[in-house]
Each structure stands twice: as structure tokens, then as C-alpha cells.
């Protein structure tokens, strides 16, 4: 079985990312308390639309968000982080994809970490979700991934409210069966090139 080992504490560290897709956001609610107002908007913004058919997840190909897929590399970081500052409100969507490889069918306990609302799919099946975004602290939710022998597509559909300093961050931590899992990405050709580039960078 090829692929990368899990990172520190069982975190997945290799991903493909599409987005962010940013759309203007308006809500008629009003509140003089800015933090309370933002908390309310976060409680209602997430739509959790079913992902459906993802299409080919290849570098440069368009995702369901009509944004290109990119390989995400951050030198072993535990999280995908595409945070930025917003001067006007935006509804943010971004998708994350990775592959977990195993030699046998296993049920894996995982922890999803994010400030965003996230739906987690394993081979097209919804396995769990964070229902709404938060400003802080980061959210954590344990869920079960039903892995089949071979390559398993893990797909995170993320939504966030873009307002001021917005934390668009997500991570996936494997809590058991760590020695039985290798990590890859959906674009196998890119995975080979990424492995070579990563080895070069880490040897410098």
C-alpha cells in the first residue's frame, strides 16, 4: 500500500482543496451588539446542501463549486487554513478532499476540527457534521468512518461566514487503527509528483 503515513497525533496532512467560493451575504436581522449579531448570522448561514456527484478530483479541474482543485501543502501542518479578513460579509464555501487507504474493511474513529460548518462524506456517504460555524474556540466532533479495503475518498464540504478576521480552518484526526492507514490524494498522478517535491523540500 503506497501513500503517506498519518501525521503527528494521527492528523491527516495531505489534501486537495477547492475554493474558497465567496458570495455576497445579506440578512435582514439587526442587533446593536456586534458579536451577538455575528453569532446569530453564523447560526443560520450554513445550508448543508448534499454534495452529490463530485466529478473527477484532479489538479486544475473544476469542482462542484466551479473552483479549481489545488494540491494543498503546508509542511506537515495538521490543518487546512485558508483564513483571511473580510471588510464586507460573505458566504464562504470551500471543499477539501483526501484519500485514506487500508488493506481491509475497518471502522475508524476520527475527530473533525473546524471553525466552519462541515459535512464529512466517506465514499459518498454522509458520516457526520459540524452544524454551524463559530468564531472561537475551534469545534471538535468525533465520528466514525466506514473504510473499505483500498482507496476511500474523504470529502469535507465546508461553509463559513466571512466577516472581519475569519478562520476558515479544518482538520481531520484519526484516533484508532493508525498503523493500518496510509494517506493519499484523489489525483494519483499529482500524489507521485507531490511526494517527490515534498521529499526534496524536507531534505533542504
What is the role of each PLM region?
Residues 80-84, 95-97, 138-142:
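Short structured motifs
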Residues 1-78, 157-204:
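Accessory carbohydrate-binding/adhesion or oligomerization-edge regions at the termini
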Residues 119-171:
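Beta-strand-rich ligand-recognition modules
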Residues 102, 107-121, 154:
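Aromatic-lined ligand-binding clefts that engage carbohydrates, nucleic acids, or primary amines
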Residues 92-94, 104-106, 114, 137-139:
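Residues that act as N-cap/strand-start positions at coil-to-secondary-structure junctions
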Residues 11, 15-17, 99-101, 144-146:
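Generic structural detector for well-ordered beta-strands
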Residues 101, 107-109, 142-146, 171-174, ...:
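Ser/Thr- (and often Asn-) enriched beta-sheet segments in non-cytosolic proteins
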Residues 88-100:
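Short beta-strands within extracellular/lumenal beta-sheet-rich domains
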Amino acid at each position: 500500500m503506497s501513500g503517506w503515513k498519518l501525521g503527528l497525533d494521527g492528523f491527516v496532512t495531505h489534501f486537495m482543496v477547492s475554493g474558497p467560493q465567496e458570495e455576497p451575504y445579506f440578512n435582514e436581522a439587526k442587533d446593536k451588539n456586534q458579536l451577538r449579531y455575528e453569532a446569530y448570522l453564523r447560526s443560520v448561514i450554513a445550508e448543508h446542501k448534499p454534495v452529490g456527484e463530485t466529478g473527477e478530483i484532479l489538479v486544475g479541474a473544476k469542482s462542484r463549486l466551479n473552483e479549481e482543485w489545488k494540491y494543498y501543502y503546508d509542511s506537515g501542518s495538521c490543518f487546512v487554513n485558508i483564513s483571511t479578513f473580510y471588510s464586507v460579509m460573505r458566504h464562504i464555501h470551500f471543499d477539501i478532499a483526501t484519500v485514506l487507504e487500508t488493506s481491509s474493511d475497518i471502522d475508524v474513529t476520527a475527530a473533525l476540527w473546524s471553525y466552519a460548518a462541515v459535512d464529512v462524506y466517506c465514499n459518498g456517504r454522509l458520516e457526520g457534521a459540524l452544524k454551524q460555524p463559530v468564531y472561537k474556540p475551534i469545534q471538535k466532533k468525533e465520528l466514525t468512518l466506514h473504510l473499505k479495503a483500498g482507496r476511500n475518498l474523504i470529502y469535507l464540504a465546508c461553509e463559513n461566514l466571512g466577516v472581519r478576521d475569519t478562520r476558515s480552518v479544518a482538520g481531520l484526526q484519526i484516533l484508532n487503527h493508525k498503523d493500518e492507514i496510509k494517506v493519499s490524494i484523489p489525483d494519483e498522478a499529482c500524489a507521485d509528483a507531490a511526494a517527490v517535491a515534498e521529499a526534496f523540500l524536507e531534505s533542504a
